[in-house]
Regions:
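N-terminal, charged low-complexity regulatory/assembly segments
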Residues: 3, 28, 32, 43-47, ...
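N-terminal secretory/membrane-targeting helices
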Residues: 1-4, 64
Length: 105
């Protein structure tokens, strides 16, 4: 399944204005918003947070990488081009955990 099709299968983020992503020790890493260039990542990170209780574990990160579909391969070929995918790659490879907190509209 490609990225666009996968996004249609995941929970809606219409009720969100943002999603804060932090390290396990609470250090702010990024804020995803429903705007061009971030909307797909907002959907994926939100869905992972819902499935895994607000924690993106290495297993959750690997699932998220599958959901990014063709963009995952592009991120591997061009490190730094897709920072939200790079973050999941780092989580999956390092064993670290990310925390996500949704901000409702």
């Amino acid at each position: 399944m490609n990225f666009s099709d996968r996004l249609q299968q995941l929970p809606s983020v219409a009720q969100l204005t943002a999603l804060h992503v932090s390290s396990a020790d609470g250090q702010a890493l990024t804020t995803l918003e429903p705007k061009p260039g971030q909307a797909g990542s907002l959907v994926i990170y939100h869905a992972l947070g819902v499935l895994y209780g607000g924690r993106i574990t290495p297993a959750a990160a690997r699932l998220g990488l599958e959901w990014y579909a063709e963009h995952h391969a592009d991120a591997l070929a061009h490190p730094g081009k897709h920072p939200n995918i790079d973050r999941l790659l780092a989580c999956a490879n390092s064993g670290s955990v990310l925390l996500v907190r949704a901000v409702a509209a």
